[in-house]
A protein has these predicted regions:
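Catalytic-core regions of hydrolytic enzymes
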Residues: 2-143, 152-164, 172, 225
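Active-site-adjacent mobile loop/cap segments within catalytic or ligand-binding domains
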Residues: 21, 148-241
């Protein structure tokens, strides 16, 4: 898949492969959610590699923030996406809550105000992962400027656009989603000013059915199909701009 890109010197439109950075959530000393002998960091890595394969078959250029079981800081993840001139950043996760009956996928985009308390708690939990590795949380003035003036407003709009496309694809594929599948909060990993970024929760390890479903490659392919189709449709909308 190719997209048009302006050459600053002569304003000629040139084509480059649409580039995606996939971020398998957690890793290394940070296992993420752990339930029923399943670990979030293992499922997200498998899912990211499988999705990478689907996308590369369609001609997309795909990078992973990690290819093995290792810890990557939130800041480094964003830098990897920027270094590779990514057109889209997707952080892949699996959720876990006290209520075992809760199940289904959801997608999150950046906002300075959380859409609900549960999402605010999720963002707070995900934003603390660097502390596990002893990495101090930095005071980042850039982040505040992003949230205050929404630098590159198109980035926020593009992220929301992808989220809505994903929700529709999930429903069309008959995959279970939360009642309000698109939510917003201040996820640190999504704070790139010029790269549309989303965080996708594939399901809930705290739910026995979801846990079994996501730990199996064949059944996991269903939600990855919806995610890959969302990417295909999103690229089509961006190529028209």
């Amino acid at each position: 898949r190719l997209i048009k890109q302006s050459n600053k010197n002569n304003n000629i439109k040139i084509k480059k492969p649409f580039t995606i950075t996939l971020d398998p959530g957690h890793g290394g000393l940070d296992p993420g959610a752990v339930r029923y002998s399943y670990r979030e960091k293992d499922i997200t890595l498998l899912a990211a590699k499988e999705l990478k394969g689907l996308l590369e078959k369609k001609g997309y250029k795909v990078f992973l923030t990690r290819n093995k079981d290792e810890f990557i800081s939130l800041r480094k993840k964003k830098n990897i996406a920027k270094k590779n001139s990514s057109d889209l950043f997707i952080s892949i996760h699996v959720d876990s809550v006290k209520k075992k009956s809760t199940r289904g996928t959801s997608i999150y985009t950046l906002s300075d105000k959380a859409s609900d308390k549960v999402t605010a708690m999720l963002a707070e939990r995900e934003n603390k992962v660097d502390l596990i590795a002893g990495i101090d949380k930095e005071v980042d003035n850039e982040v505040f400027s992003i949230l205050l003036d929404l630098q590159r407003r198109d980035t926020k709009n593009a992220s929301a656009s992808f989220a809505e496309i994903y929700v529709n694809k999930v429903r069309n594929n008959g995959y279970r989603a939360l009642r309000r599948p698109h939510r917003q909060a201040g996820f640190a990993v999504l704070k790139s000013p010029d790269i549309p970024s989303v965080l996708v929760e594939l399901g809930f390890l705290s739910n026995p059915k979801d846990a079994k479903y996501l730990s199996n490659k064949k059944s996991r392919a269903r939600v990855l199909k919806a995610l890959s189709e969302a990417i295909f449709d999103y690229v089509k909308t961006r190529s028209k701009i």
